[in-house]
Every structure is written in structure tokens, then in C-alpha cells.
């Protein structure tokens, strides 16, 4: 059972409060602490600022903040309500005040409360300012919640997008700067990419240096607009052969520098594949008539080398940036794809002639 001790501040309780202020120990304590009569309003702990109601307000006491409602036992509640009915009061607070006034002589004999216990109680001005400050904060929070809830409309959505876009220019600018810096670095390094030809070729185990490595590769460069040419990277050689490869034709492509094609003027997309200064041929002997006049004997020496049989443990596929010193950077001649096809056609006819003779 609960009995509301302070249901209302008006009504019949005014006289009771006046009596407490003049005589009872509680009134004297209040006067000693606050220095004025009727300062009970300063001891109200209002909860309206936090969303509560006035009837849920609490009070400051010597032992801290306490609730205004008092829980009674069953027997005490029955006696209290019987007394309230006998007094003819419609509010429990009036019956409580009557009881306090009737017990005033006994209350006066009780020891007074320690004024130091009320040192933490704020003054009237501070108590009035705190709810006002809390109320303003609550109003601001409600306005922000309303604005957030009303953002479902198209206008609010547009404003939210504008705020988001306005807060992102710094990030966008930094990302754009990074892109520009990356493109500039790629353009500056285009020549270096062109200088190293991308190739995969055939290696001859057992021979060291450039003489034992017949690393002849195909290099292609593709250029899109003003972007630097994209190609493979010079790779160490890998070797392969198969059992019974004595009569197999040995194909090779000579390694050479990859010349970066000039970027097109209009920013148009241009797919440009260029072959290195090697030629495609079959190792059926030295064909001087089909070989370019500017090919050196060094390349012919490599074309004469035989591939060894494959050992399963020696297969290596290596792709990466090879040192430029391993393969000479000097270009000994350029040959177009048409010339390579013609050279291959000559080898094919030569092979057919040898078969017909046999």
C-alpha cells in the first residue's frame, strides 16, 4: 500500500506547512539552513526536465533525495485510511498534515537535524536554473529528433545529401590528388617500362651466362589513350622439352627492347601490339636467304642450340622483373609482324621441299 505524502502543494496543506515553519524541528532546521521561511520549494527535486511529471518529483532530505510516496504496511495503511475517513479529508496528504500538527509537541522534543547534512542541497536559484537548463536541452533534443524523423520527405533527403556532399570535399580532393599523382608517376615511368622487354623464353640447363640461356620472348605493348603502354615484365627463362623431341622444331623469339608506342593525339583508345626484334623460325639449319640481313651471328648461334630433354624436376616457370644486365639492352634490329610471317612461310616451304626430296 502506498500513501501520497505530498499529492498537492495547495489546498488544505497550507496551514500545516505554516505551523511546521513556525514551530516544529523540521521548520527550525529549514530556517537554520536556508535562512528563510517557506523554503521548502528549494528542496523539491523536479524531474520534469528529464521527461517526468510533477507528481513524480522527489525531495531533498538529510539522507539524500527521497520519493514523495511512502509505502505503508497493510495494518498501517488500514489505520491511516480509517483516520482519513474519520477526518473527512479527500486527500491522504491532508490527513498526514493533521497527524503532524497533532504530534507537534512530541516532535519538538526530538533532536534537531544536522545542518551540515543539507550542504549538498542546491540553493533556490540554482534549483530553479537547473530545471530551466534541462528543459532547454530537452527542447533541443526534441527538435533534433523531429528533424531526423521528418527527413523522410524528399526535401529533407535532399538537404541531408547536400550536408553529406558538403562534408566530403576534403576527402574527394585528397583522393583526386592521389589519382593525379599516380597517373603522373606512371607517365614518367613509361620509358622504363618500354626499356625492359617482356619475354618468356627457353633456357638450356648446363650452360652459364648469356650463352647458355636462349631467352627469346614475345613482347607486346597495349596502349589505351594517353595511358602508358601495358606489357609483360622481363622474366627469367623457363625451359621445357618433351621425350622424343629430337625431330621437334625449336621455336624462339629474340628478346629486345620494347619501344613504347606514342600515345594517340585525341585521347582515342588505341590497342597497339608490337613485336620485339626477334624472329620466329624453325631450327632446320641456317637459312641465309630467309634471315634478315642485319641479324648478327650471335642470334644464329642461339638458334643452333638444341633443347635438352625435359627433366620433371627442372621445370621452372618464373615471372618477374629480370635484371637488365642479364640481357643486353642494345637492339640489333627491328622486324615487323609481316616480316616474321613471311620468314615463317619461307621455313614452311623449305620443310616441304626437304620432305619431297626424301
Curated annotation (Swiss-Prot):
GO terms for biological process: regulation of secondary shoot formation. Residues 7-16 have a biased composition (Gly residues). It is found in: Nucleus. Keywords: Activator, Developmental protein, DNA-binding, Nucleus, Transcription, Transcription regulation. GO terms for molecular function: DNA-binding transcription factor activity; sequence-specific DNA binding. Residues 143-156, 285-296 have a biased composition (Polar residues). The keyword Nucleus applies. Signal peptide: none annotated. Residues 52-110 form the TCP domain. Residues 1-29, 127-163, 282-308 are annotated as: Disordered. GO terms for cellular component: nucleus. It comes from the Eukaryota. Transcription activator. Binds the promoter core sequence 5'-GGNCC-3'. Forms homodimers and heterodimers. This is Transcription factor PCF6. It comes from Oryza sativa subsp. indica (Rice). The gene is PCF6.
Amino acid at each position: 500500500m502506498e500513501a501520497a505524502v505530498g499529492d498537492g502543494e495547495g489546498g488544505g496543506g497550507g496551514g500545516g506547512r505554516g505551523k511546521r515553519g513556525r514551530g516544529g524541528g523540521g521548520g527550525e532546521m529549514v530556517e537554520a539552513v536556508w535562512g528563510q521561511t517557506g523554503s521548502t520549494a528549494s528542496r523539491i527535486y523536479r524531474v520534469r526536465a528529464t521527461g517526468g511529471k510533477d507528481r513524480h518529483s522527489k525531495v531533498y532530505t538529510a539522507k539524500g533525495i527521497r520519493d514523495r510516496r511512502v509505502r505503508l504496511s497493510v495494518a498501517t495503511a488500514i489505520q491511516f485510511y480509517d483516520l482519513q475517513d474519520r477526518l473527512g479529508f479527500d486527500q491522504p496528504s491532508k490527513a498526514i498534515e493533521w497527524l503532524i500538527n497533532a504530534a507537534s509537541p512530541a516532535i519538538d522534543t526530538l533532536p534537531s537535524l544536522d545542518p551540515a547534512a543539507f550542504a549538498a542541497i542546491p540553493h533556490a536559484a540554482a534549483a530553479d536554473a537547473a530545471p530551466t537548463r534541462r528543459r532547454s536541452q530537452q527542447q533541443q533534443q526534441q527538435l533534433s529528433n523531429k528533424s531526423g524523423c521528418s527527413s523522410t520527405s524528399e526535401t529533407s533527403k535532399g538537404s541531408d545529401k547536400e550536408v553529406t556532399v558538403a562534408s566530403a570535399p576534403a576527402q574527394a580532393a585528397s583522393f583526386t590528388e592521389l589519382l593525379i599523382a599516380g597517373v603522373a608517376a606512371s607517365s614518367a615511368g613509361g620509358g622504363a617500362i618500354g626499356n625492359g622487354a617482356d619475354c618468356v623464353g627457353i633456357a638450356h640447363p648446363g650452360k652459364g651466362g648469356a650463352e647458355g640461356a636462349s631467352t627469346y620472348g614475345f613482347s607486346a605493348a597495349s596502349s589505351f589513350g594517353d595511358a602508358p603502354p601495358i606489357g609483360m615484365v622481363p622474366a627469367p627463362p623457363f625451359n621445357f622439352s618433351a621425350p622424343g623431341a629430337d625431330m621437334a622444331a625449336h621455336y624462339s623469339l629474340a628478346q629486345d627492347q620494347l619501344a613504347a608506342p606514342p600515345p594517340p593525339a585525341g585521347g582515342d583508345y588505341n590497342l597497339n601490339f608490337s613485336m620485339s626484334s626477334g624472329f620466329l623460325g624453325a631450327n632446320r639449319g641456317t637459312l641465309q636467304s630467309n634471315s634478315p640481313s642485319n641479324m648478327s651471328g650471335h642470334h644464329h648461334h642461339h638458334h643452333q642450340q638444341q633443347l635438352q630433354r625435359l627433366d620433371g624436376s627442372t621445370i621452372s616457370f618464373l615471372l618477374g622483373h629480370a635484371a637488365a644486365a642479364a640481357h643486353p639492352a642494345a637492339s640489333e634490329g627491328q622486324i615487323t609482324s609481316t616480316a616474321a610471317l613471311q620468314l615463317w612461310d619461307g621455313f614452311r616451304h623449305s620443310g616441304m621441299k626437304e620432305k619431297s626430296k626424301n
